[in-house]
């Protein structure tokens, strides 16, 4: 992942990489009936994390920003759920890759939760405070 000049990871890049990695995993898992449906859900949820983060950064209001960040957190949690359901078969390499993605989904959930708590706190303290793009 690419770091910004301040040494922090670009969250837009991180969510994009997460979605791409989930798609890479989808190509490696056994094509069972349950995996096919679970994979569809997993791919949708993982892509939605980054898409909603982009929408949050382009939000027109504070309420819209908070709503989009909540959706990001929800989709990251959902991604984790679908990742955990996937049957990796007997391939330990695929299982380890899946476990890394479960960890990344957990970290993204925590990051969006922290952004949400900080933003809601700032919003309650000063409702006129502009919070758009603060975490970009």
Question: Over which residues does each language-model region extend?
Answer:
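Short, C-terminally biased terminal segments at protein or domain edges
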Residues: 1-55, 59-136
């Amino acid at each position: 992942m690419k770091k910004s000049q301040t040494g922090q990871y670009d969250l837009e890049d991180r969510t994009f990489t997460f979605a791409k990695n989930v798609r890479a995993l989808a190509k490696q898992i056994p094509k069972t009936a349950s995996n096919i449906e679970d994979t569809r859900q997993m791919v949708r949820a993982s892509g939605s994390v980054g898409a909603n983060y982009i929408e949050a950064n382009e939000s027109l209001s504070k309420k819209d920003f908070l709503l989009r960040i909540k959706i990001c957190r929800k989709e990251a949690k959902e991604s984790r759920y679908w990742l955990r359901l996937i049957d990796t078969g007997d391939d330990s390499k695929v299982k380890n890759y899946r476990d890394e993605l479960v960890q990344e989904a957990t970290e993204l959930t925590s990051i969006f939760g922290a952004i949400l708590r900080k933003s809601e706190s700032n919003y309650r303290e000063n409702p006129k405070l502009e919070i758009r793009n603060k975490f970009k």
